[in-house]
């Protein structure tokens, strides 16, 4: 099970009620950060999250409300004597923007910051999870992200063990470590004595975008779809590259994702006004506040902890 922490749920600019976009996903001891709007470091402090646990940051696009908090996080890591490389991922031109950002002021990090530019669809493999990327429609280079926890092995199956003429013992620990061992003259594979794999959690974050088909495609079987829904109505949206509540709901229904969180609310709306509209337009949707936490397991096991 992974933990999703909403550090900032609003869009465009901070308000007294909410900060600009940032989402942390905790998997084991690691924190994976998606977008770093201004004030994200403060939000992490309030949420009790240690920025030194961050190995990777994924930025959807380079509008200020999605990345201006990056410098504060990097400078704090430096103050705390970080030595581990920090990896930052984003759309084309990320390297230039981040390089310029880090050159401003009298500061240089004492650790490596490696920027990875991604164009289009990619599938990035890490120890316990994968990140899938897809381009979204926001008028500038912009990405959506899928966080996919890797599937876990099934439990040891005593019936399968007995059918091979074996009894439970220390060999099981060795098999779990090595995946294949030899007992006597027989080769035993882990898959032979365990049940079905347990599907890992899948969370999709669209970033800022108009509705596009790839959101539906990449959100299939998602446990949680975090979809931007900046505006209540198309009248408010006008010609901006954003999504309304109803459009986000249509994406959700088409994808058959299990849960929907509406994200990036425009500052013109209070939480109450927006939540009432969301309940009328898409009753299944969840409207997170800053510091809400969602625990996500595979197979649709989702627990919402609202503040």
UniProtKB/Swiss-Prot annotation:
The keyword tRNA processing applies. The active site is at 65 (proton acceptor). Zn(2+) 2 binds at residues 65-66, 208, 264. Optimum pH is 7.0. It catalyses: Endonucleolytic cleavage of RNA, removing extra 3' nucleotides from tRNA precursor, generating 3' termini of tRNAs. A 3'-hydroxy group is left at the tRNA terminus and a 5'-phosphoryl group is left at the trailer molecule. GO terms for molecular function: 3'-tRNA processing endoribonuclease activity; zinc ion binding. Optimum temperature is 50 degrees Celsius. Binds 2 Zn(2+) ions. It holds the Pfam family Lactamase_B. Zinc phosphodiesterase, which displays some tRNA 3'-processing endonuclease activity. Probably involved in tRNA maturation, by removing a 3'-trailer from precursor tRNA. Also shows activity toward a broad range of substrates, such as intron containing pre-tRNAs, 5' extended precursors and non-RNA substrates. Homodimer. Belongs to the RNase Z family. This is Ribonuclease Z. It comes from Pyrococcus furiosus (strain ATCC 43587 / DSM 3638 / JCM 8422 / Vc1). The lineage of its organism: Archaea, Methanobacteriati, Methanobacteriota, Thermococci, Thermococcales.
């Amino acid at each position: 099970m992974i933990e999703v922490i909403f550090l900032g749920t609003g869009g465009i600019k901070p308000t007294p009620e909410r900060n600009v976009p940032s989402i942390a996903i905790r998997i084991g001891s690691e924190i994976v950060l998606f977008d770093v709007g201004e004030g994200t470091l403060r939000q992490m402090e309030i949420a009790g999250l240690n920025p030194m646990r961050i190995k990777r940051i994924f930025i959807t696009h380079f509008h200020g409300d999605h990345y201006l908090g990056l410098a504060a996080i990097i400078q704090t890591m430096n103050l705390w004597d970080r030595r581990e490389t920090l990896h930052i991922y984003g759309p084309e031109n990320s390297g230039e923007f981040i390089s310029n950002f880090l050159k401003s002021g009298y500061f240089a990090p004492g650790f490596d910051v490696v920027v990875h530019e991604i164009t289009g669809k990619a599938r990035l493999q890490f120890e316990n999870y994968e990140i899938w990327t897809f381009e979204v429609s926001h008028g500038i280079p912009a990405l959506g992200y899928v966080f996919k926890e890797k599937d876990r092995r099934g439990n040891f199956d005593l019936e399968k063990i007995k059918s091979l003429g074996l009894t439970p013992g220390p060999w099981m620990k060795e098999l779990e470590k090595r995946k294949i061992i030899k007992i006597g003259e027989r080769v035993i594979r882990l898959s032979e004595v365990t049940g079905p794999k347990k599907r890992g959690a899948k969370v999709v974050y669209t970033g800022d975008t108009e509705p596009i088909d790839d959101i539906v495609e990449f959100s299939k079987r998602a446990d949680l779809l975090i979809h931007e829904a900046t505006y209540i109505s198309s009248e408010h949206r006008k010609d901006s590259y954003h999504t309304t509540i109803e459009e986000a709901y249509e994406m959700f229904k088409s994808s058959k994702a299990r849960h929907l969180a509406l994200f990036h609310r425009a500052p013109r709306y209070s939480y109450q006004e927006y939540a009432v509209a969301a309940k009328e337009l898409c009753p299944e949707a969840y409207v997170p506040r800053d510091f809400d936490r969602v625990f996500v397991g595979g197979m649709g096991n989702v627990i919402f902890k609202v503040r």
